[in-house]
Amino acid sequence: MDLEATTEETMHEIVKLHPVWPWLNQVKGIGPQTASLMLGYLLSPREDKGPSSWYKAAGLYVIQTDKGESRLPRYDHLEKGEKATWHPRIRRNLYVVGTSLMKAKGFYYDFYTEVKDALKIKHPDWKGRTHSVAFWKMIKLFLAHCYEAWAEAEGIKAREPYPIEILGHRKIARPH
């Protein structure tokens, strides 16, 4: 067996011991390798934190530009000498997760298409931007569910997701 195969096999055995693996294993599009990529960079849930702490770490928070536009932070928009406030590997790995969720065409893909269709109607001038916005909203929903499942698996009473706790929404899309 070559080094790559041995490494993957070891990675699969380790991720299956992770507290959130039973939940992740039910998500269409998430396998041991994809889960390992993601879980290797995420901190364990805490009672005083919510999934928004993961959003911040991945740079999935919205900023306002000088032109009044909303967007996610990007390296090519940093001022000279300014440091990123997010971890680029987390975002890259979440992009891989999102691509896998899209290819699997499960619950999260359905959510993505609903959001994208709504954005096309609400913002017909956005053209290619609707994919990006819907994609990262899908990732954030997945992260909220993952955070909740992981906290529950460890017996932690995690905070409610931001849309419920702060914005006063009554429900959030659930996968199962």
Language model: regions and residue ranges:
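Catalytic phosphate/metal-binding cores of nucleic-acid and nucleotide-processing enzymes, i.e., regions
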Residues: 5-17, 62-64, 71-76, 158-168
